[in-house]
């Protein structure tokens, strides 16, 4: 089972620490968080991309994906006026360009909250318009775009497997895929494996965390309530061959290396010996 480190937890340290830790601790790849100060797409365009490419080479660490910050600060393609929407889409396009240049396997985005007063027809119309434009760009440059469903604490747009199916049906692009952060279905009493059943080969990536079942908090494996050992057995038996990013975000920023080590060790302990 291939593992990825998410760099968001290292945001108060130089990004080289994330590459170094991923290499030394034994992660198989790295998922780059696209927020300041590390890898904000406009900063990469201004020259920072050279450092990212150099670090990947120095530490021999594959960049499995690039995840620009699209959940509302300051970019959210689902909320605000046309100027705000246009800025968000332009940033995501730039992020795809930067992902292409750093040889990332995908660009991962989400449909953040569309606002409490926005009716469903407006939400889905805006999502379809956004994804159509982004997928056309992705097809033109040869970049896979992954749409991540969020928890209902974070969004009111794409939050479950059926929402993903709806989005994929609205924009049937060969470059559009989805994934599952296993916290999202768990807090909604939705079976994680239903994503595998419903999405098939459109399921491109996994974020592995533990969950308390009552919030969007991402815990290290073993700190929450999820039956992770049994879940990973099912995922392996289903034949999943992609990466599993152990997605530690802001909860563990005070000691990212220590928690990244602990998270990886606990995750691997969940797996059969031949998958570790």
From Swiss-Prot:
Regulation of protein activity: Inhibited by Zn(2+).
Residues binding a divalent metal cation, per UniProt: 148, 181, 207, 247
Keywords: Cobalt, Isomerase, Metal-binding, Nickel
Enzyme Commission no: 5.1.3.41
Gene Ontology molecular function terms on file: identical protein binding; metal ion binding; racemase and epimerase activity, acting on carbohydrates and derivatives
GO BP, one annotated term: amino sugar catabolic process
Name of one Pfam family that matches: AP_endonuc_2
Inducers of expression: Induced by psicoselysine. Makes part of the frl operon with FrlA, FrlB, FrlD and FrlR.
Entries under SUPFAM superfamilies matching the protein: Xylose isomerase-like
Class of enzymatic activity (EC top level): isomerase
Active site: 148 (proton donor/acceptor), 247 (proton donor/acceptor)
Keyword Nucleotidyltransferase in record: no
Family, per entry: Belongs to the FrlC family.
PANTHER family, per database record: HYDROXYPYRUVATE ISOMERASE, XYLOSE ISOMERASE-LIKE TIM BARREL DOMAIN-CONTAINING PROTEIN
The protein's name: Fructoselysine 3-epimerase
Species of the source: Escherichia coli (strain K12)
Gene coding for it: frlC
